[in-house]
Amino acid sequence: MSLKQNYSAADIQAWMISNLAELLGVDGDEIDATVNLESYGLDSAQAMVLVSKLEQLLGFQPSPLLLWHYPTIESLSERLAEELEEQSEEQNTDSATANHSNGTPVLDLQAEVVLDPVIHPGGAIPVDFPVTQPKKVFLTGGTGFLGAFLIRELLQQTQADVYCLVRAADAQAGKAKIQTNLEGYAIWQEEYESRIIPVVGDLAEPLLGLSSTQFQALAAEIDTIYHSGALLNYVFPYSALKAANVLGTQEVLRLACQIKVKPVHYVSSVAVFESPVYAGKVVKESDDFSHWEGIFLGYSQTKWVAEKLVKIAGDRGLPVTIHRPPLIGGDSETGIGNTHDFINLMVKGCLQMGCFPDVEYMLDMSPVDYVSKAIVHLSMQKESLGKAFHLQHPEPVSLSVLVDWVRSFGYEIKTLPYEEWQAELINNATSVDNPLYTLRPFLLERWSDEQLTIPDLYLKAKRPHISCQDTLKALAGTSIGCPPIDGKLFMTYTAYLIQTGFLTLA
């Protein structure tokens, strides 16, 4: 790392324009310093490359979150110039600081919980909605991982047509996008084609990206809503995720209250209980989630606020159910999963480094086929309305068991105390060649007065114990059960990852 240099905001701005243009493969005159960086399609991997180059220029690593809190090159350059002045001349090797001093504003999540007062089922036609036999279902998130399996379950468990919100140029391209997604997970069947209706729009836009006329027509057509769409990112702050995850949820609730009342089945997350207030406690499905203090991950913050909006709508009389999955694993039958999810990136990245962290972490992921089957079944039970469900794995295993399974495949890996593993991460995951590179902000960014990373906070304060007993009771008597996390499941997952080339044989 170089010594800190004195650069003006103009110097930094000129440097950023040049380097962003190089990163994106465009001419420098195509970069406008006053335009939001997101408009250039900057993803988390490219953002980390830019941060690394900034570190070499400035002599300290700026918080990656600054790229979203100061979203234009002009505003970011001004902030970085201020940070240069604020920095002492001594070498700063701990670049990530507490959120009161890392340049990111402190956020009051409770103040974000504001649902448009016009969103109220009282103004819609009260109908005897077909909870157990939906006819026309509207689904968000259908081009995602869980969403693909929800489409399959809705088509298999019901006779309904599924209207899928999709970003695309037109309906034909939208349907092709949905089909390609299902094909990617090997769950597409030709008979699905006639029952999938693409709705071209955008979760992050007002009225879901539809015109007022289109929005009203959709509200009149559908009878049930499954809202699983969300932007999942472990690096982006709340501000970058709010439009899709929070405001998008508000628009879904608006749709549910237009023309006629439609039940909303919302896919939330167990992350709503990340506040240290719940640390070490048993949290049941019916427990309140009023505490937000100490939730630092932007994605988790948006899920907390969004679920609060759903709860407000429920209090206003809208029929809702809430489904809280944990980390979601691949299909327990085929092993097919999302190779970009946290667990797979962690495993591959740790294998490349040759070490795993030696931590007391319980692996509680649930296979996607279990999660999707449970959500669709539970949503069609009248007694489910107004309730929340936990799709947590009922029998989690420790991370050490995963490490033992990895070793059984012949991989030579060691375990290190978490602090030593973090040092290895800093020294070895220095480019996008290692999957952990894009997760560095999540794994290394320091928060709170104690200067702890998010994993540190979990490990020190202990995670809550998410109870799923009420959910298991609701599923009793069905064939829906959560497969055990055992050697068979690990073999199924690993075989798929090796077959696709995501992992290589030891």
Swiss-Prot record:
Q: Which gene encodes it?
A: hetM
What parts of the sequence cross the membrane?
A: none
Cofactor note, please? Binds 1 phosphopantetheine covalently.
Q: Name one GO molecular function term.
A: phosphopantetheine binding
What is the name listed in the Swiss-Prot or TrEMBL entry for this protein? Polyketide synthase HetM
* Keywords recorded for this protein, A-Z: Antibiotic biosynthesis, Oxidoreductase, Phosphopantetheine, Phosphoprotein
Family annotation (PROSITE patterns)? CARRIER (PS50075)
Cofactor dependence: pantetheine 4'-phosphate
Q: O-(pantetheine 4'-phosphoryl)serine is carried by which residues?
A: 44
Task: Extract the Gene3D superfamilies matched here.
Answer: ACP-like, NAD(P)-binding Rossmann-like Domain
InterPro entries linked: ACP-like_sf, Far_NAD-bd, NAD(P)-bd_dom_sf, PKS_PP-bd, PP-bd_ACP, Thioester_reductase-like_dom
The Carrier domain covers which part of the protein? 10-84
GO:BP terms for this protein? antibiotic biosynthetic process
Query: What top-level branch of life does the organism fall under?
Result: Bacteria
